Each structure stands twice: as C-alpha cells, then as structure tokens.
C-alpha cells in the first residue's frame, strides 16, 4: 500500500500508510491524520518516521523529517541481498528474511517491501507472521536488519579469518 515515491538528493522516500484518527470531545469529533514513511539511500541506510497532524500534507512532512533524523546503517552483501537469514520482532509482528539468488527480486509484502526497496536490497525472500500492522512490521523489519552481521564482523569477534568463517 505504498502511495508516494519521491527522490530528494540521494534519499528515496516512500509513504507507507496514511490513517485518519479521531478524538471525541464534548462538541463532537476532532479528526487528525497520521502518516508512516520510510527513507533510504538505496545503499544500506534506512529510517522510518511516524507523523501526526490535523492535515495530511503536514503529517507526511513531519513523518519524512523524523525518518531522515532516524536513519541507521545496514551491512549489505555485494550481491544486493542479505548476509544471512534473519528474524525480527516488534510487539505482535514477527518477520523472517532470507537471502535470495540474483534475479529473484524482492518477495515481500506491504510495508516490509517498502523498507527493503529504500534500503537497497534487490534480492530477498521475506515473510510476516502475526500482526500485519504497518508500524509494527516496519519496526520489526528494521530491527531484523540491524541484527545482521557481516562476515568481517563475525571474524573479528571470533578472532578468526574471513576464509574460516565463510567455509
């Protein structure tokens, strides 16, 4: 359900969801809007933002600003895929992602697809279990991507060479 794709400088921005929410007061209802966005540089940096405002464009702008301030770096494989299979959890949402061979594409649904596209991952198999709430899926996906370790990081931690790790 990705709506808008915009490029500013080297960042790719995607709007994942816009939601109308209401607050009931003595005089009736007050409506406001929430927006969920992801921002990435297609080279391993990704961030998400959640903005709330009385009007849709303002909510989207707030979400984009928060996403740009909330960016993290992901260690990608040279083939445009993941280093290894990973799992991520956030509240009721669980995600599982595994590397895929060249030409597979992004096999993922909804909010997870948008996160993977802006991160720069080109080949991946992914599945969401449990809650498919977009906010929780985005948080679980970024949580999983942050857990990913490169062979260099694992080799340094174990005190071995990269060749020994990749065997």
Curated annotation (Swiss-Prot):
GO terms for cellular component: small ribosomal subunit. One of its GO terms (molecular function) is structural constituent of ribosome. Residues 11-74 form the S5 DRBM domain. It comes from the Bacteria. Keywords: Ribonucleoprotein, Ribosomal protein, RNA-binding, rRNA-binding. It holds the Pfam family Ribosomal_S5_C. GO terms for biological process: translation. Gene3D superfamilies: 3.30.160.20, 3.30.230.10. The keyword Isomerase does not apply. InterPro entries: Ribosomal_Su5_D2-typ_SF, Ribosomal_uS5, Ribosomal_uS5_bac-type, Ribosomal_uS5_C, Ribosomal_uS5_N, Ribosomal_uS5_N_CS, Ribsml_uS5_D2-typ_fold_subgr. The keyword RNA-binding applies. The N-terminal domain interacts with the head of the 30S subunit; the C-terminal domain interacts with the body and contacts protein S4. The interaction surface between S4 and S5 is involved in control of translational fidelity. HAMAP family: Ribosomal_uS5_B. With S4 and S12 plays an important role in translational accuracy. Belongs to the universal ribosomal protein uS5 family. Part of the 30S ribosomal subunit. Contacts proteins S4 and S8. This is Small ribosomal subunit protein uS5. The gene is rpsE.
């Amino acid at each position: 359900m990705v709506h808008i794709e915009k490029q500013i400088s080297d960042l790719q921005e995607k709007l994942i969801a816009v939601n109308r929410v209401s607050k009931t007061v003595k005089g009736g209802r007050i409506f406001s809007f929430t927006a969920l966005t992801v921002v990435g540089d297609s080279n391993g940096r990704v961030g998400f933002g959640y903005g709330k405002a009385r009007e849709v464009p303002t909510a989207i702008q707030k979400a984009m600003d928060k996403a740009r301030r909330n960016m993290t770096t992901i260690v990608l494989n040279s083939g445009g895929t993941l280093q290894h299979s990973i799992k991520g959890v956030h509240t009721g949402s669980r995600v599982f992602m595994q590397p895929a061979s060249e030409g597979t594409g992004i096999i993922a649904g909804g909010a997870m697809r948008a996160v993977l596209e802006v991160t720069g991952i080109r080949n991946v198999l992914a599945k969401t279990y449990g809650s498919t709430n977009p906010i929780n899926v985005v948080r679980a996906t970024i949580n999983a991507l942050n857990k990913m370790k490169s062979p260099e990081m694992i080799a340094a931690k174990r005190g071995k060479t990269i060749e020994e790790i990749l065997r």
